[in-house]
Amino acid sequence: MDKGKQIYGIDISKDVYDVCTPEGGLLQFENSEGGFRAFAKAIPKNAHCVMESTGYYHLQLAYFLSDRDFAVSIVNPLKIKRFIQMNLSRIKTDKSDAVWIMKYGASQDLELWEGDSELMQENLQLTRLLSVYIKQSTQLKNKIHGEHTLGNPSKVVVSSLKRQLRSLSKEIKKLEERLGENVRSEHQKSLTLLKGIPGIGEKTAISLIVLTDNFTRFDSYKGLCSYAGITPVIRESGSSVKGRPRISKMGNAKLRNLLFMCSFNACRFNTACRALYERLVAKGKSKKLALIAVCNKLLKQAFSIVRSGLPYDPNHCSVIK
């Protein structure tokens, strides 16, 4: 770590955020533009601000500080939790969180956080809103089906639901078109390469590019698989294994669900994925576990192909272990 940096641990909540100074002092600011300005005035230019990734709450402050040339690092909350456990602390309050974040930052070589470009920020926002609208669309379809099962559905109710569904479908189409235009404007080559992988369609390819920032967020496909939550977790104690191996499910649920849907077509049309699926099923593995392995294989193919810039080759992919 740069010895010239002054570590400030920041614990952020919806309305306020607590700050632990390098000397261990505690400060509190409003989680607002005014609070950001007050904090920026209170710290030196060589301050290194360390905070946990807390959904949306940390982003505004992170961008504010980064835009003003302060060093910013964003840490996975699990790392802070493990750091606290390693130091045998049983007392955990909001203000002590800021202390532990500062201590963690002072003891680690931290990567500097770089904010996304404006286009990338829009792509992520479009992706999140699409997820909301698609979920609402599914709920409306289920509601319409439920009304028809009543035997004598109200025409007023059904008409209203259908109007809402049509309106939502139009919005989904607009957002998908905008997202596609954005991705094609910067990552057309990657999009073409991904669509060349049997089992991966255009929507999935676009989502992969957006969620992984064109596969630049990860140094290896293993890190990407962990992010997707499709790595196996084995629970064991001593020499005894407690239960079957399961996937972690701690990663990005959207990415995991997309891959799972793609795995069905991949088993039919992707040479390597089909061979893997058939081999695992022949060994007595469950079909679901085999499909998860196919998800892992698909993600490995996608990572390798985009990073290398080489198109899909069934003969090459079939020997990837």
Regions found by a protein language model. Name each.
Residues D2-P22, I101:
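Gly/Thr-rich phosphate-binding beta-strand-loop-beta motif of the actin/hexokinase/Hsp70
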Residues G24-H48:
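Nucleic-acid-processing active sites and adjacent nucleic-acid-binding tracks
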Residues F29, G34, L208-K283, K287, ...:
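Phosphate-backbone recognition surface of nucleic-acid-processing proteins
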Residues A47-Y57:
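Short glycine-rich phosphate-binding loop at a beta-alpha junction
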Residues I74-L193:
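Long, charge-rich intrinsically disordered scaffolds of nucleic-acid metabolism proteins
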Residues S169-G180, R184, K203-T216, N257-S263:
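Amphipathic, charged-and-aliphatic alpha-helical interface segments
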Residues P198-E202, L224:
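Small-residue hinge/turn detector
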Residues A272-K321:
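Acidic, carboxylate-rich catalytic segments that either coordinate divalent cations
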